[in-house]
Amino acid sequence: MLSSSSLYAAIDLGSNSFHMLVVREVSGSMQILARIKRKVRLAAGLDKNNRLSQQAMERGWQCLRIFSERLQDIPPSQIRVVATATLRIAENSDEFVGKASEILDCPVKVISGEDEARLIYQGVAHTTGGPEKRLVVDIGGASTELVTGNGAKASQLSSLSMGCVTWLEGYFNDRSLTEENFARAEAAAHETLKLIAPKLIEQGWQICVGASGTVQALQEIMIAQGMDELITLPKLQELKHKAIECGKLEELEIEGLTLERALVFPSGLAILIAIFQALNIESMILAGGALREGLVYGMLDLPIEPDIRTRTLRNIQRRFQLDVEQSQRVKQLAEHFLQQVAKPWELDSRCHELLQSACLIHEIGLSIDFHQAPSHAAYLINYLALPGYTPAQKKLLATLLKNQSGPIDLFSFNQQNALPLIQAQRLCRLLRLAIIFANRRRNDTLPALRLKVSDEALTITLPHGWLMQHPLRAESLQQEIQWQNHAQWSLVLGEQDAQT
């Protein structure tokens, strides 16, 4: 029986949507039990005097009546409910908050923009991998939070009065997707950003992380259209032109854009374009969590680990009882291969990290069965929660593990967008070879081999006589040559000349 003392809930009364996150604490980490979202569009109910309409408040209260059933099983001390931008500015927010507290039978706290920014940063820091020095961007319905920080500590907190709902009402209220409307929306966003942009740029960052529905929508579009996962200004401009071609909000159709997100997508896109331009952002990735995760981790009082991905991989190894020594052996061998070909094959630090990850969990499929273990591994990685990895990175890991041995499914590489196709395939080739050479599960049988590449032609040079001394692996390598050649990947095997 599930103990209620291990359950936690966080509710975010946003300007566009209300969200509820229910989790269970498991061995010092968070297991998600439910994510519930309702589109309330509270900000759209504000009049010129900043008073919420009765209809907007009723939409919100009805949503909370639905949420309240789930809260009955959770200790009140383990529930946090916060309200953000719209209820910060609404003149009659007390009326809404008072009734909301009665419905939920727990306090509702209207938090400041700075507190919201801090919680968003904490949620990102607990759930998103990559470099420690980061810029976090969250575009809400009525406010946008921009935060810089290093590790667990936020250094610059900003909350601006612009959001996808308020910009929709202000600059796309005629429902026309024109150059003029986008220009007005972007200009207004630039004006809002001009005071804080220099301060944020001064702080600097190594990675930019987006934590909003707009960024989630962009990821869904890019996956559907076969782009890689990095959000860049040229991609944003291209999507803007596609939106303008549609003419009207009601006719907005972009491959990968859901109907639910379509209404506020153009306004959120205009704000994001202005942010990229004002802050000179090169690229952005999707965050693993934000405000609600920040609230939950605050209740759990867990430290922020420097390397979230390492924690995730360690938990998987423990949960599925993987052979850690063998995983390390394969990883070290793959790294040795990577060092030899990284420059000509243009494999950067991002490739290095993802190859390491694949090596450390490559045997997870054995926890189901030896037969079709690579397919089992891909299935597990596709559906397990992997804090620190983006959805695109999860898909790449699943693709690598699916193709770690046996026939190569070239089509599957087109289904991932974490890396360019050619880089993903090159990582796969190195992983497959590392697994073959390490399959004796002993360090003293690993050869001192050399790799050389010319375009996609890969040549392996082994010590003289090694193939004759290791006939089973020699046979496996001959089979591997056939598999890779069948995929149009040239693989040549040779030995050093006998020393005289």
Curated annotation (Swiss-Prot):
Reactions catalysed, as given in the entry: guanosine 3'-diphosphate 5'-triphosphate + H2O = guanosine 3',5'-bis(diphosphate) + phosphate + H(+)
This entry's Gene Ontology molecular function terms read:
guanosine-5'-triphosphate,3'-diphosphate diphosphatase activity
Q: Which Pfam families match?
A: Ppx-GppA, Ppx-GppA_III
Q: What EC number is given for this enzyme?
A: 3.6.1.40
Report the protein name in the record. Guanosine-5'-triphosphate,3'-diphosphate pyrophosphatase
Q: Explain the purpose of this protein.
A: Catalyzes the conversion of pppGpp to ppGpp. Guanosine pentaphosphate (pppGpp) is a cytoplasmic signaling molecule which together with ppGpp controls the 'stringent response', an adaptive process that allows bacteria to respond to amino acid starvation, resulting in the coordinated regulation of numerous cellular activities.
The cysteines covalently paired via disulfide bonds are none
One BP annotation, GO: guanosine tetraphosphate biosynthetic process
Q: Recite the UniProt keywords alphabetically.
A: Hydrolase
Q: Which pathway is this protein engaged in? A: Purine metabolism; ppGpp biosynthesis; ppGpp from GTP: step 2/2
Q: Where is the signal peptide?
A: none
Return the NCBIfam families for the record: PRK11031.1
Q: Which domain of life is it from?
A: Bacteria
Which PANTHER family does the annotation name?
EXOPOLYPHOSPHATASE, RETROGRADE REGULATION PROTEIN 2
Q: Provide the family line.
A: Belongs to the GppA/Ppx family. GppA subfamily.
